[in-house]
Amino acid sequence: QLENQTSQEMESWSEKQSYIVLGSLIMASAQENIDTCPMEGFKSDILEDVLKIDKESEKIAVVLTLGYRAEDDNFQNFKKVRKPADKFIKFL
C-alpha cells in the first residue's frame, strides 16, 4: 500500500510510473510522424534549475525530446536491425 511506503520508496515508485507515460507519448508521437528521443543520465540539478522545478515537490525522472528529423539525415533510411523475438523472449 502506498501510504505505508517511505518517501524513498514513493519516489522510486513514481519514477517507474513515469515510464508508462513516456511509452504513451512515444507511441502517440509516432502516430503523428513526430520523432522522439527518450533520455536518462542527464544532470537533473541543472535541468531542474533551468526549468524552475520546485525541488521540494517535483523531480525530473526522464526526458523526452520531440521533433522532426532533418530531411538530409543520412541514417533515416538505413535498414533497422532487429533480433528475432525467440532470441530474447521466453514465454512461460
Give residue ranges: language-model regions:
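Acidic, surface-exposed loops and disordered segments
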Residues: 1-92
